[in-house]
Amino acid sequence: AVSKDFVHWKFAGYCSFDGVGGQPDSEKTYWAPGVIVEGDSAHMFVTLKDDSTPVWGGPSNIVHFSAPLEDMISGWRRVNTVVDTPISIDATVVKNGDRWDMWYRDRPTEDTGGLYYAQSNDLYHWTLKGLAKGDINNVEVTKHTYQEGAYAFQWKGYFWIIADPHKGLAVYRSKDAENWEYQGIVMYEPGTRFFDNTRARHPSVIIRNER
């Protein structure tokens, strides 16, 4: 969907990948895309499942697609697989100086679930760094045993991550995008507008006029 004011939106079509898709239903599952623009290209880091069977479409990887800015509906072409563990989901990417940082939900083993991070100097080659540092995976501080759908951005001199622990949205901030401090929960109570009758889930943020 596209908008000029972030209030009024117009449906623009269904995305296709490597020329396949463009319809409401797909044999594969693409969810929780993290999209970043660099130069004249858009880069999508999406949770990709090779089927769409209930309930969640089977094992998943985080896969990199790119598209020219003038065709962000049907221009997506696969670049590579960034995270190949079978339960990796929900990537978010932010530029940090001369590099890019990614965070995602993963559970490589039964006892190591949490938010993980990776770093890249070019968006194409990534180094997996392990569990995110600071308070993000510190249950004693946050009381959150599960978080997904994280979104990272920069605002007012800090890097921020807002994640979904299924009880409102958990907020973290950091000066260096590595050592995170927990800021608490927001949007726990349901809203009052039409279709806004539940607590917030899976966030995304756009900064306009310093807000």
Show where each model-derived region lies.
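Carbohydrate-active catalytic/glycan-binding domains of CAZyme proteins
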Residues: 1-211
